[in-house]
């Protein structure tokens, strides 16, 4: 179910404080965050976030196309290594 429009997009308070501080300083340092659930809003354009994927931090540069998505959508948590059985069958034949 989609979020109500009257509520507005969800952004964690600590992330919003870091965004406001980064806009004032404008030094280009990435913002380190574990908040994958925060929605990307227009105030974040031009900033880089280091989003935690459960193991490491993935750098995400925010552009206009990212608005409305969540930060976690750009930091995948799973890596697909492939199905080993299909490779073995091709080599054997």
Swiss-Prot record:
PROSITE patterns noted in UniProt: RIBOSOMAL_S19
UniProt record, GO biological process: ribosomal small subunit assembly; translation
GO cellular component, one term: small ribosomal subunit
Superkingdom as given in the UniProt entry: Bacteria
Single GO MF annotation: rRNA binding
UniProt-listed HAMAP family: Ribosomal_uS19 (MF_00531)
Annotated family: Belongs to the universal ribosomal protein uS19 family.
Known function: Protein S19 forms a complex with S13 that binds strongly to the 16S ribosomal RNA.
Descriptive protein name: Small ribosomal subunit protein uS19
